[in-house]
Amino acid sequence: MTDAVTSTGIHVLPVTGIPEIHAGDDLVRALVRALSPADGTPGGDLRDGDVLCLSTKVVSKAAGLVIPPEDKQRAIAASTVRLVARRHGARTTTSVVEIPAGPVMAAAGIDASNSPDGLLLLPEDPDAAAAHLLEGITALTGRRIGLVLT
């Protein structure tokens, strides 16, 4: 993105114009469109060396990794490599678990926020998901960038 790296540090710039993503949407094309200037050059706002940070939530939405709320405990159990802790509250119990990709997180990373269709699961292989997105963005823009799933 223009002026993203300077000799004195980095600049963090938001990507605007990404539509609401749904299961089956082409996330690569949506990102490239959002990163394209008014002249329509695909990804024209990207520069070699830029790093795009993208939430796993949007990747999960595009991949259709949605389950109904009543399946939450079953999904946590299926995603658990190791139970790290269990916290009992007044109304709920939260499990902190290690998931197959390696991170340790509450509820196996299952997320209900901004997901009106149900609960979002994390991608099974976030590295492969990031590589797929990066390959697509590079193919459409010709830019050599980095990509981090957050």
Where do the protein language model's features map onto the residues?
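N-terminal and secondary-structure boundary signal
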Residues: 1-150
